[in-house]
Curated annotation (Swiss-Prot):
The J domain is necessary and sufficient to stimulate DnaK ATPase activity. Zinc center 1 plays an important role in the autonomous, DnaK-independent chaperone activity of DnaJ. Zinc center 2 is essential for interaction with DnaK and for DnaJ activity. It comes from the Bacteria. The lineage of its organism: Bacteria, Pseudomonadati, Pseudomonadota, Alphaproteobacteria, Hyphomicrobiales. HAMAP family: DnaJ. This is Chaperone protein DnaJ. Changing residue 26 to A: Loss of function. The gene is dnaJ. Changing residue 59 to A: Loss of function. Residues 5-70 form the J domain. One of its GO terms (biological process) is DNA replication. It is found in: Cytoplasm. Binds 2 Zn(2+) ions per monomer. Its cofactor is Zn(2+).
Amino acid sequence: MAKADFYETLGVSKTADEKELKSAFRKLAMKYHPDKNPDDADSERKFKEINEAYETLKDPQKRAAYDRFGHAAFENGGMGGGGGGFGGGGFANGGFSDIFEDIFGEMMGGGRARRSSGGRERGADLRYNMEITLEEAFTGKTAQIRVPTSITCDVCSGSGAKPGTQPKTCATCQGSGRVRAAQGFFSVERTCPTCHGRGQTISDPCGKCHGQGRVTEERSLSVNIPSGIEDGTRIRLQGEGEAGMRGGPAGDLYIFLSVRPHEFFQRDGADLYCTVPISMTTAALGGTFDVTTLDGTKSRVTVPEGTQPGKQFRLKGKGMPVLRSAQTGDLYIQIQIETPQKLSKRQRELLQEFEQLSSKENNPESTGFFARMKKFFDG
C-alpha cells in the first residue's frame, strides 16, 4: 500500500514553516496518542504515521530530500547509490521528545527542559548502508563514500547570525528556553514559543544558512573495511555525523555492512561451505577435482572410491580470516552425486548389466535398510 503524503498526514501545506509543523503535530499527537486510545489499532497506526511525517519534515535536510524524491529518498538505505545508501532515520538526536514535554507538561502540569538556554547541542548521528561482496569481506578494502550531511556554516561559524552581529538573549524567556504559565491550580512549563527553546533570537540571520547555523553538504569519506568483517557489522566513525548546534560536538556516522550472498560459498562464522556435484562414476571409482578458493588459489580434492552423497571434505585454513586475528577458518566441501539423465540405449544397457552384477557388498546400506524394514513389518 502506498504511503500517505507527509504534508497531508499532518494537514499542512508544502510551504508550512517550523511553527506550523510543530502546531499541527502537537494537535494530532494529543488526539491519537495510545494512552488516550488504548487498544485502538487505527489510532496507533495513525500515531506512528504522524511521528514519521513530523520527524522528516522538521529536519531541513530530510525535508529537502523528501520534497525532491518523495518516500524513495528513505527507501533501501535512503539517498545515495551504488553499493551504499544514506539515511538519518533512527539516529537523529532530539526527535520529538521536546514536543512531548510540552504536551504532557500541559496535561500533567510539569515538564523539564531538554537543553539549557543557548546551550551546546550535539549533532545527530547518521546511518549509511553499505553492501560488499564476500571476496571484499575476505580481503578487506578501503571504500570511498559520499554522505549528504549538515555541517557548520562557514560564514557565521554556526551562530546563525549575520557576520558582525550576534544572537540576542530571548526577551520572552530571558534565555532559559522555557516559559511558565498558571493554569488553575497548576503551573505549566513549556518550550518558549519565541526562541523554540534555544534561549536566543536572531534578528539579522546569516544569508547562507538562513539562521540555522548549519548548511547541507555532500562529503566524501574513506571507510576502512577490515578483513574478516561479518554481515551485519556496524562501523562507527566518531564525529562524522551532523554538525552540532551553537558549538556543540558533531554526531557520529554509523556504517551498517551487509555481505552479498555468494554464488558458490556459504559462510558460517569463519568457516565456508561449498556443495560440489560429481558424477556417479567418479563417486564409485574415485577421482579428483580442483576448487578455487576465495584467495584465488586452487586446492585439489581427492575423492576415494565409494564416496557417498553428503560426504564432507575439510580444507584447513581455506575459510575466512577471523576479524583482527591471525587465525583463519576452514572450507568444507560437501559432495552431491549427480544421477545420469537422458541415457542412450547403450548406456542404459550397461547400467542394467551393472545392476545384474551388483551384490550386497556393492550396496550395503540399501540392502541392509530394506532387510531391516521387511523384518520390522513381518515381525
